[in-house]
């Protein structure tokens, strides 16, 4: 919400993930294009208190932002995986072995605890979003690698942190002047509640997001 108030149109995040596939190795970077939600009770919408909206979310990552992010990883000489499915778990505990094996059976590619809610809220705010999933470990499924520990994650994440900074710098330099994707109008056909039925308090609270559709001037 704060990003929207600041006028942000493009958003790229970076976070640690575990790999669920042999080919996604520690220190690789994945730019996922799909998510599976295994969280419980997290706030992941701006709506529901007097206004109902249902955004299209079949493709949760901005294709333009994803391409720019992937190209930027390659431009700094690092291994990038274009696309993949990120399973978002509740945490803060890591997976059990049974869960890790199940997600592999489901053909998930990486596992993390944060990015899905970011993607949902960014889409509702009509912000173009992509994430750099920094592989730090093989979760706990791999028989030839030790179980994930915080120490392991931090060590690999620190090594990837400098890479992420370089990549984000490249991303910013490659952003187009104007957006042509559908993200910028994600709410245009998503608002179900009649304009005159939206409470004045809600209209005011959500003015940065709904203003252009409800003819609200901030």
List each language-model region with its residue ranges.
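General beta-strand structural signal in soluble alpha/beta enzymes
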Residues: 11-15, 31, 80-83, 87, ...
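Histidine/lysine/aspartate-rich catalytic loop segments that bind and position anionic ligands
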Residues: 49-93, 125
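A short, charged, Gly/Pro-tolerant segment at domain boundaries
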Residues: 180-218
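Active-site/ligand-binding-proximal alpha/beta "capping" segment
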Residues: 72-109, 185, 192, 196
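Metabolite-binding pocket within alpha/beta catalytic cores that recognizes anionic/polar moieties
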Residues: 1-58, 214-218
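Zn-dependent metallopeptidase/amidohydrolase metal-coordination segment
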Residues: 113-150
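His/Asp/Glu-rich mid-to-C-terminal helical/loop segments that flank catalytic regions of hydrolases
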Residues: 140-188
